[in-house]
């Protein structure tokens, strides 16, 4: 079991949800590197939390892969989505709008919130632009220096990983399973910590939990299949019994008609209405 868990751990990369959750949690350097490369400027991250749960005013719960703040009160939500079709723009827009509520909970006045970024790394061109990085400014606010971008949604196509540009190197690092081959030191160290260091036990426990969940789901699925199969057999048996009873009733009906049993008596014996007997006799080709 231990070797199986470690083998699964060694196959994981930063695009895998559970591994990413453990690797990036609290790692300001690694998350700062991600944001800095995507925005093409140095960003100093002051706070990081993975799997940040937020509940809106209607009671709807959302979970953000990575929630971060920098030392200038800018806010970042970073999502990792292997299926680009699931990286829907409305979903990211909703995340962006929820960010302000989180920041206020941290004690930052609403008026001091500067910019809100939602960065989504996907294994494909979710933005349909053909670019490695696609940015959409969704809101503007007036400042004493004029209009300033307020909400920004950014898609990063992880498959755009050829060349030596920082974003291409980053994209290769995100899917690299062997942490020793990761180029950026910050990412290499956060992966090493989970695969060989103090985070390994946490990650192995999570893998065991996933395995237990999968086994439980498989048992539940198997039990459901057995139940459905038995119910199908019962339904089939009921239909066969019904058909057999109807066939027997028709045989009795035909026999009684051929022996000139009165209609009223036939209805009494077979517990059928006059109309039903007449209809069934017609279908059997019998003459009353």
Predicted regions and their residues:
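Conserved single-residue anchors adjacent to enzymatic active/cofactor-binding motifs
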Residues: 1-202
């Amino acid at each position: 079991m231990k070797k199986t868990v470690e083998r699964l751990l060694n196959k994981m990369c930063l695009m895998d949800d559970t591994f990413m959750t453990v690797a990036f949690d609290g790692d300001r350097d690694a998350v700062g590197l991600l944001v800095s490369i995507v925005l093409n400027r140095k960003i100093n991250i002051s706070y990081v939390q993975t799997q940040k749960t937020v509940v809106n005013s209607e009671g709807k719960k959302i979970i953000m892969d990575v929630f971060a703040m920098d030392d200038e009160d800018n806010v970042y939500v970073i999502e990792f989505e292997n299926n680009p079709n699931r990286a829907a723009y409305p979903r990211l827009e909703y995340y962006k709008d929820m960010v302000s509520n989180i920041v206020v909970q941290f004690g930052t006045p609403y008026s001091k919130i500067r910019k809100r970024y939602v960065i989504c790394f996907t294994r494909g061109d979710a933005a349909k632009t053909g670019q490695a990085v696609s940015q959409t400014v969704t809101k503007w606010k007036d400042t004493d220096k004029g209009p300033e971008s307020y909400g920004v949604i950014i898609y990063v196509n992880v498959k755009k990983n050829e060349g030596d540009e920082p974003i291409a190197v980053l994209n290769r690092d995100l899917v690299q399973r062997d942490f020793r081959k990761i180029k950026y030191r910050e990412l290499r160290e956060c992966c090493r910590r989970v695969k060989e260091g103090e985070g390994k036990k946490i990650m192995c426990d999570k893998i065991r939990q996933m395995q237990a969940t999968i086994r439980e789901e498989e048992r539940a699925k198997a039990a459901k299949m057995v139940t459905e199969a038995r119910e199908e057999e019962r339904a089939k048996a009921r239909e066969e019994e019904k058909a057999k009873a109807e066939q027997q009733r028709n045989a009795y009906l035909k026999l009684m008609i051929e022996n000139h049993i009165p209609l009223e008596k036939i209805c009494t014996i077979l517990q059928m209405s006059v109309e039903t007997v007449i209809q069934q006799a017609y279908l059997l080709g019998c003459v009353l």
